[in-house]
């Protein structure tokens, strides 16, 4: 029995484990070393503790004695070399025994597979012994008793039953897991097909080839928002489809348009809601992500355009774009959460008269952004320009400029129409037959829309052109008229609204209006001045001797325009008396002043209130029973 033992002197160092043994393993070790817990008593434990203490004390004494007798350096080196030689000798012996065992097995196998066995034989064995010289036979084992055979069969049957039960449990668990997985996959793919049937584009994610994604963004948007328009369709544990929206915020956002008039919010656009019937469904989440991304891009482009329009009065803050329409009215645009109460209660809203205008502007900026996307698609389908080392600048979309042009043009058209109505109302109350015709937005010609593009794009192109409105008016004298063109352009300089007046005054052919007028007050003064000139010419023509046919008119004096640009006329009677008439026209009234002049007073510009014979008559808009202008002139012209 001693010869069968195998001792190996190279024992590995015992290292402390990083993790302690689990409790079941420790219990098994305790049972194997100390026996069952039933045999443990308090006396046996105390005896074991005392025995361990005595052993530790003995070991400490031995170590103390050994530490006192230190070896010198030479003895330590000799001892080290001896230990090294012993280790090498044991290693060589182990190697030789392993080679002998390998040669034995190889020689035994050479009887059946000589080629394979020859590769593992040593060179010495090949020389001294031929292949196949060693053979093995199976001998009958000693017979076993029936009890041993019966026990072996029982144990084998138990192991097989245990293995079958374990295999059955694993198969049942696998089947249950597979059934759940199939149900989850089926539900996932049903929802994916439902998304595809709704018309959404499905594709693989760029850097995740095994993950499907839905393209809900706009391919013609700027790269910042185009790359964010792709979301992953992931599967939850129960198979529900999860939309991984990435950088898109979870809360909805919308661009709000407000109208401020005289410092008070008088209009606010309605919050934009998604068209999905069920916002919690996968389609509702996709629509919300698409709408939110679109609204963020819209506000981003509004902010970009506002930065280049600072010279036109557009101001920007952290989350606000503001631009003026007139001196009293402003438009405010910001990006807000439509579900919060701050959507309406941010500032005091005391009126809702401009809600329709705010809604119209909100729809218009979204339509203009869609139009910009279509223009990007059109440019992308055309041949690219020549390569250049300079980076191509992405132009700002025209979103604010068309809105500002329309609002400013509408404001100036309404103002001009109101002004013309007031002035011509005064003239008609004075008995003067004249009229004007307004043609708003005469530049918009829907019959000339380009048929090669969709109707919506053609219609938008018409409103992106400079807006122009025309006012044609007749004057008092024959063949006298004027035309006012109001032109608004915010795309190319000169920016803003320009007034152009075309005048036809046969009595004053040298009078020409300025080419371009930028202020509506200046345009009003010029129009009023031209009408006043025509009134002076009409009075002069009415009282001229060539047209005095009746006896009554023959006894009247004639008026001659001395300073027509100041509205002054002069008459001289047969006896040498002089009278001066002054015509004063404003938006609200028409005033005629007549007074006597002596000597050099005919050259004076104003009539003093103490002038003898001062007569004044005023006409204002509205029905009146006063005599007409020509009747009054005829009355004051009597000699």
Swiss-Prot record:
GO cellular component: core mediator complex; mediator complex
InterPro entries: Mediator_Med17
Subcellular location field: Nucleus
MF-aspect GO terms: transcription coregulator activity
UniProt keyword annotation of Manganese present: no
Keywords: Activator, Coiled coil, Nucleus, Transcription, Transcription regulation
Database matches in Pfam families: Med17
Chain coiled-coil ranges: 160-187
BP-aspect Gene Ontology terms: regulation of transcription by RNA polymerase II
Transmembrane segments: none
Main location group: nucleus
Functional description taken from the UniProt entry: Component of the Mediator complex, a coactivator involved in the regulated transcription of nearly all RNA polymerase II-dependent genes. Mediator functions as a bridge to convey information from gene-specific regulatory proteins to the basal RNA polymerase II transcription machinery. Mediator is recruited to promoters by direct interactions with regulatory proteins and serves as a scaffold for the assembly of a functional preinitiation complex with RNA polymerase II and the general transcription factors.
Quaternary structure note: Component of the Mediator complex.
Annotated family: Belongs to the Mediator complex subunit 17 family.
Protein name: Mediator of RNA polymerase II transcription subunit 17
Encoding gene per record: srb4
